[in-house]
Amino acid sequence: RQMCIRDSHLADWMAEADTVLLEADGAKRHPCKAPAAHEPVLLRSSDIVLAAAGLSAVGKPLQDVCFRLEAACTLLAVPPETPLTPALLAKLLASEAGGRKCVGTRKFYAVLNQADDEARRAAGEQTLAILKETYDVTGCLTHFEKGERA
């Protein structure tokens, strides 16, 4: 169920905060996704956009880890059984049909979550290097410690 807030109320609340994080589209608990035609829903006043993905997806078939699989396969030009590589993840995040969709002139960054072990950190570092070298996109690795997870 969606909850809607009037634009005037949202603007008032946002004016009271230093930073406001809004989820523009969800991934139905999948670690990566491609946006639907109507996504993302960005406010005109948004000045920074973050595209997030979970590193648990790397090395696994797209069909097992990607929300909106058909859109992702079309964007990446690969079949559903293709394992997600750092290069494919970087392309998915940096593409203007993917994570960078509708960003325009806003600042854009990639956030790679679930860097929970050495293998995932290595995949994340490789993805970040490809993002920087190929797409001029800056990003970061994140993870939660056991006590921090919901």
Q: Predicted segment positions?
A:
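Hydrophobic anchor at the start of a short beta-strand
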Residues: 19-20, 108, 137-139
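Canonical P-loop GTPase G-domain recognition
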Residues: 129-150
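Short, small-residue-biased leader/transition segments that mark boundaries at the very start
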Residues: 1-5
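Conserved catalytic-core segment of NTP-binding enzymes
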Residues: 6-15, 25-134
